[in-house]
A protein has these predicted regions:
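Transmembrane beta-barrel wall of Gram-negative outer-membrane proteins
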Residues: 1-99, 125-130
Length: 184
């Protein structure tokens, strides 16, 4: 039994450091969500003249995962200088599998072009943002703000596999030739 679920946690704390009691604070929040989906689908394609060359029905199962992390560390020095670090991480992943049966012209055979198509797909994306920010009070009326960041995006989308199996006298058989596909 697949049950949708979600978890999250957050917290923070402030400490005072040294004889000047300079505040150091941090905050963290994290979350994880998993959602499942099930759909009945119909796939139909025609030529420009209206001839149906694909007419399939099937079921698709999908799992969607989302993860989030946010963090902050902040330090004040003598109420004049300020340094902070921020981190954000977002991850999103989806995987699905669908089985479709019916007519497809790729199944050229004696069984009225009937067969089974299995389509599997994975999408995996990650974003990471790092920031370092500072504020320096040089005088009562002059300050310096500076910042730097390093960010990273990784996308593995899509990783897709399509397998076609044609109807045969004793069940199904794997098609020959270029009918199996893999995209990455």
């Amino acid at each position: 039994l697949q049950i949708n679920r979600s978890y999250s946690i957050s917290g923070g704390k402030r400490f005072y450091i040294g004889k000047d009691k300079n505040p150091l604070s941090f905050f963290l929040t994290a979350g994880h969500t998993t959602d499942y989906q099930y759909t009945d689908e119909v796939i139909r394609n025609t030529t420009t003249s209206g001839t149906i060359y694909k007419d399939m029905q099937g079921k698709k199962y999908a799992e969607n995962i989302s993860q989030l992390l946010l963090a902050n560390v902040d330090y004040d020095i003598n109420n004049r200088h300020h340094v902070s670090y921020n981190l954000m991480m977002i991850h999103a992943g989806t995987q699905s599998v669908g089985d479709y049966t019916g007519k497809n012209s790729i199944f050229s055979d004696d069984y009225d072009n009937l067969g089974l198509t299995r389509r599997q797909q994975s999408n995996d994306n990650l974003l990471i943002v790092n920031q370092l920010l500072t504020n320096w009070g040089l005088t009562k009326s002059l300050s310096l703000d500076a910042g730097a960041s390093y960010n990273m995006v990784k996308g593995y989308e899509p990783d897709r596999r399509i397998n076609n199996i044609t109807k045969a006298e004793n069940g199904y058989t794997l098609l020959r030739g270029n009918s199996q596909q893999r995209y990455f």
